[in-house]
Swiss-Prot record:
It comes from Tetramorium bicarinatum (Tramp ant). It comes from the Eukaryota. GO terms for molecular function: toxin activity. Residues 27-38 form a propeptide. This is U-myrmicitoxin(01)-Tb5a. Contains 1 disulfide bond.
Length: 54
């Protein structure tokens, strides 16, 4: 009986991991995109900064 409870616990952990993983990946992509924004004060000659800085 203990083995079936252990298998049930692992199955629940596995299912919860599968359900939670896409949200973690989406958050990671959002953070990476926010970090990738060009800082025109640091790199004023970057092509994305044309017309932003004098």
């Amino acid at each position: 009986m203990q083995l079936s409870h252990l298998l049930l616990a692992f199955a629940m952990i596995f299912v919860m991991t599968i359900m939670y993983a896409p949200q973690v990946q989406a958050d990671a992509w959002a953070d990476a995109n926010a970090d990738a924004d060009v800082n025109c004060e640091v790199t004023p000659y970057h092509p994305d900064c044309r017309g932003v800085m004098p």
